[in-house]
Amino acid sequence: MGKTKVVGIAGRYGTRYGSTLRKKIRDILEKRYSPHTCPFCGHKGKVYRLSTGVWACKKCGAKWAGGAYMPKTESAKLFSDIIIRE
């Protein structure tokens, strides 16, 4: 059987680092590479990460600071009115 059945995308690490850590990495990477919605134009699937914490939308060209693995963090959801000012 394949060694990536349980750990999925983190199977690229092979047998290194232990199964528990690879399962945690799997959860993080699945969130990072899942299709995200742009907070400016609302288009889903065109958001990508430029660098750590910097996200951009291919459709509208907007760039914003977010989390390292998610374009919008939990704290940003709570304080969205304060963070985004027009």
Curated annotation (Swiss-Prot):
UniProt cross-references to InterPro entries, sorted A to Z: Ribosomal_eL37/eL43 (IPR011331), Ribosomal_eL43 (IPR002674), Ribosomal_protein_eL43 (IPR050522), Ribosomal_zn-bd (IPR011332)
GO molecular function, one term: large ribosomal subunit rRNA binding
Zn finger intervals (C4-type): 38-60
Coiled coil feature spans: none
Key words, A-Z: Metal-binding, Ribonucleoprotein, Ribosomal protein, RNA-binding, Zinc, Zinc-finger
Biological process terms in GO annotation: translation
Gene3D superfamilies, per the entry: 2.20.25.30
Cofactors required: Zn(2+)
A cellular component term, taken from the record's GO annotations: ribosome
Family: Belongs to the eukaryotic ribosomal protein eL43 family.
Protein's recorded name: Large ribosomal subunit protein eL43
Species the sequence originates in: Desulfurococcus amylolyticus (strain DSM 18924 / JCM 16383 / VKM B-2413 / 1221n) (Desulfurococcus kamchatkensis)
Underlying gene: rpl37ae
